[in-house]
């Protein structure tokens, strides 16, 4: 049985003071032991968050990593080796904001995926379609292509030590969300695509939903058979709301 996961992506939010306040709020939460819970602060705050949460079961991740695993001459980047040294356990790769706004392509994302795994970290591979692609009926095609890029490069077994997050771009930060049935349809298609390569891998990989998940809709979303938890954006900046989402995943 797949263990649920809830991961909070704090994006480019926070000051030292607000992060300290959020850490304090998270430490007060009653969190389910049956759920893997993670937060991903801006890299500037990684050590502050690792230290602040060390008495809890919450693990710390990163929002991005460099294309090379080791530290070196790559201005402005953070290597997976440095993230591991700071206490990170998992790293986002291919988030839609980096695909859409930074222009990261599959070849770059594949290098990041490999670098993350090379240092023993878990990549959280993000896939998802834009509103235009959804309206054109291309959702499964787009998501399948993004997934195929990694499988073609590394083989499906590389996903054994990875997590996949489906995040419809049109539902990120908009207040819109896919219905539980719409989200389940895509998650089921992802698992079916993996099953064509290896049924055991397909059954073991955790698939998270990301797209305006809140405490109010988390229970219904997480009740779907192929949704194993959530990648949480704005709601993860509120400790009480994030705690409620985590408890929903534990039910």
Swiss-Prot record:
Annotated keywords: Cytoplasm, Gluconeogenesis, Glycolysis, Isomerase
EC annotation from Swiss-Prot or TrEMBL: 5.3.1.1
Cytoplasm found in the keyword field: yes
GO cellular component: cytosol
GO BP: gluconeogenesis; glyceraldehyde-3-phosphate biosynthetic process; glycerol catabolic process; glycolytic process
InterPro entries hit by this protein: Aldolase_TIM, TIM_sf, TrioseP_Isoase_bac/euk, Triosephosphate_isomerase, Triosephosphate_isomerase_AS
Reaction catalysis annotation: D-glyceraldehyde 3-phosphate = dihydroxyacetone phosphate
Subcellular location: Cytoplasm
Family note: Belongs to the triosephosphate isomerase family.
Described function: Involved in the gluconeogenesis. Catalyzes stereospecifically the conversion of dihydroxyacetone phosphate (DHAP) to D-glyceraldehyde-3-phosphate (G3P).
Family annotation (PANTHER family): TRIOSEPHOSPHATE ISOMERASE
Record's protein name: Triosephosphate isomerase
Species in which this protein is naturally found: Pseudomonas syringae pv. syringae (strain B728a)
Gene: tpiA
């Amino acid at each position: 049985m797949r263990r649920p996961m809830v991961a909070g992506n704090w994006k480019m939010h926070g000051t030292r003071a607000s992060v300290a306040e959020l850490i304090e709020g998270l430490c007060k939460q009653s969190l389910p032991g049956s759920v893997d819970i993670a937060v991903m602060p801006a890299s500037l705050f990684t050590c502050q968050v690792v230290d602040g949460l060390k008495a809890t079961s919450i693990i710390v991740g990163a929002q991005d990593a460099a294309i090379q695993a080791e530290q070196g001459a790559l201005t402005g980047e953070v290597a997976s080796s440095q993230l591991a040294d700071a206490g990170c356990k998992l790293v986002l790769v291919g988030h839609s904001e980096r695909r859409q706004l930074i222009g990261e392509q599959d070849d770059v994302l594949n290098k990041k995926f490999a670098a993350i795994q090379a240092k023993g970290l878990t990549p959280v591979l993000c896939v998802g379609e834009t509103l235009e692609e959804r309206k054109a009926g291309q959702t499964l095609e787009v998501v399948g292509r993004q997934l195929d890029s990694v499988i073609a490069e590394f083989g499906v077994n590389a996903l054994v030590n990875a997590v996949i997050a489906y995040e419809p771009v049109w539902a990120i930060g908009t207040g819109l969300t896919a219905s539980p049935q719409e989200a389940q349809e895509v998650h089921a298609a992802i698992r079916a695509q993996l099953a064509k390569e290896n049924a055991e891998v397909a059954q073991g990989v955790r698939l998270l939903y990301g797209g305006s998940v809140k405490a109010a809709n988390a229970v219904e979303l997480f009740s779907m058979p192929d949704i194993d938890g959530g990648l949480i954006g704005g709601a993860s900046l509120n400790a009480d709301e994030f705690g409620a989402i985590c408890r929903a995943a534990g039910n």
